[in-house]
Amino acid sequence: MDEKAKFNALTYEAMIYVDTFKKLSTVMGAEGNLIFRFGDTTVDADQIQVAGNVQFNPSKKFAAKQWYHVALVFDGATKRTEIYVDGERVAEKTASVNSFNLNGNFFIGYAYDYDGSRTWRGKMSECRVWSVARTANELKNNKLGVDPNSEGLFGYWKLNGTDVYQKDGNYYVKDQSKNHRDATSRRGAYQNGRGLSVEPDVVEMRISE
């Protein structure tokens, strides 16, 4: 993330589909700061959690081979941090901080540059970062898309196969927001900003309401 990634309020959200559960599987975030992931030494592989400067998890278990919408919402004014699944709040905790600085490495489907094992085994779509605390209704009603010009939309990666382009040997996923924070698509080892850039695989997304 760039130097503007300093948040007094924040929302992570994504559509996720797990092929296989394994320990420490990252959805998105900044390791050691604020990360949204599955599993840990004390958290089962099929349980989602928030870790970093605030840490907690719901008791809810997820099923493999099923689409879910997940969201992490932080409001610095109250320090309340909440986890939502398909628009329903499933856990909350009061953080010890009132802001987050995510300037630096931020990954989707990957943890950090020196542990290539903590990758996402599955699919994702509609990955977004907001500089506002989204409400339950906003999360529930906009799972499959939002207006790219929405107030507070910090970064928006649809991952739908139409937003990928290649430049100078790398593949990028276009940021659909007005902020031009395009993401680099990588696979395998990632060291100090370097690694194999690959074209993302695209599958049909089928959701049963």
PLM regions: where:
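Short surface loop/edge beta-strand patches of beta-sandwich-type extracellular domains
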Residues: M1-L10, V54-K61, Y112, N142-P148
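Extracellular glycan-recognition modules
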Residues: M1-Q47, A77-Y84, D115, S131-L139, ...
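Extracellular beta-strand elements of beta-rich domains used
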Residues: A14, V70, M124-V129, D175
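Flexible glycan-contacting loops in extracellular carbohydrate-active proteins
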Residues: D44-D46, K93-K123, P148-F154
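Short, aromatic/His-centered strand-loop micro-motif at the edge of beta-sheets
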Residues: D46-H69, Y114
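Short tryptophan-centered beta-strand motifs in secreted/extracellular beta-sheet-rich domains
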Residues: K65-F74, I83, R128
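Extracytoplasmic low-complexity segments
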Residues: A91, K140-E209
